[in-house]
UniProtKB/Swiss-Prot annotation:
Chain positions found as N6-(3,6-diaminohexanoyl)-5-hydroxylysine: 34
Family: Belongs to the elongation factor P family.
Name of the molecule in the record: Elongation factor P
Keyword Cytoplasm in annotation: yes
Amino acid sequence: MASFSTNEFKAGLKVMLDGNPCAILENEFVKPGKGQAFNRVKLRNLRSGKVLEQTFKSGDSLEAADVMDTEMNYLYNDGEFWHFMHPESFEQIQADKTAMSDSTKWLKENSNALCTITLFNGAPLSVTPPNFVELQITETDPGVRGDTSGGGGKPATLETGAVVRVPLFVQQGEVVRVDTRTGDYQTRVN
């Protein structure tokens, strides 16, 4: 298995730390006036999602994590697992609630949304939905003419249950595009 020395550390690198796959978020090289140089590294545990800080002496090395990102289509949810299929090999994978985290509120069944799934030893660690999704509004207050003093918007419930702030002119039953990274309304879809 490959290993990375401290001079190869950079954000996004996936390494093994204490038997857990981690992604490096930040790496700072510190050379004090006296003593040995070291790296102050901020890592995210890919299994638990926790962020931890660790220091490594210059010259230390970490084993590379056998983590693979793959794009798969979302199929359906059976109540316990979310099922995904590889678009070319038709291989299917199921992810549990911990791997899904917040992605559940952006995925609609039979939408064939292309999600990025992080796999470790063949098991899904995390699921990232597409950057933009198009969902129908199931519930929102009607926009009242002249009610623009606040300038903001109004909450709207989407067909997946997610709640997004939309402009006052958007009505119930319309389809909107939402940015899944921020949860913000982007535009109406005709």
